[in-house]
Amino acid sequence: MASQDKYYLFLDECGDQNLSSFDPNFPIFTLCGIIVSEQNLGILETQINDLKMRLWKNINIIFHSRDIRKCQNGFENFFDLSVKQDFYKSINEILGQDIYVVICCAILKEPYIRQYGKMNDVYGQSLSFIMERTVFYLDSLKNCNANLTTVIERRGKKEDNALLDYYNRVLDKGTYWVTSDRMKKYFKKFEMKWKKDNIVGLQIADLIAYPVTRYILNPEGVNYAFDVINKNIYQDRGKLYGLKVFPKET
């Protein structure tokens, strides 16, 4: 039996799934995935933990986009601008490396409600797009025999059961473009981790989700964080598969 290459898909979100009541200034839900090989994940983990040790003297700080922006929950040292600048320079160097791939799906709530109503499932829709495009990416790798583990952050028993149901539904039914058998060729394991578990891959997905969302809402705005990770968004033969915006505005 041929040996398998171990890959991970880490998923995090920006915005909420609520279609009944939402901030008109932030009418979007984004599910962001990063795909990384086991070898490259080890590189990223070492670099992130080295940065944590240098600025916090321990590796237990959890990189969370909102806390970083608000300088709270362990990031109060960012009120010292020299520390903040040091962090952003270092994290941009880490995330700017071409050793992982970004695949995101953003749901624009207002046109989505107009077309599909408020009862439809934005998380399941987003996950199906990401899983589909993950298959496209792994198919594109030469001589790849990938064994993929999907990792999602735990929310609570009810929410966790819903996440697992979404995953199994896509795996069992496939999508319009990808059959169930083709999906199951790669998707082998599904894991849920608490934020306190300090999973570097989930933290990277979190750091990427916000700038991607800001870019979709305002593509002409200044967005240095997006500029850093833009080249890592999955493309194939000139087609941008890794940034799905749904539905398309008409």
Model-derived features: positions:
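Phosphate-ester processing/binding pockets and catalytic centers
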Residues: 1-250
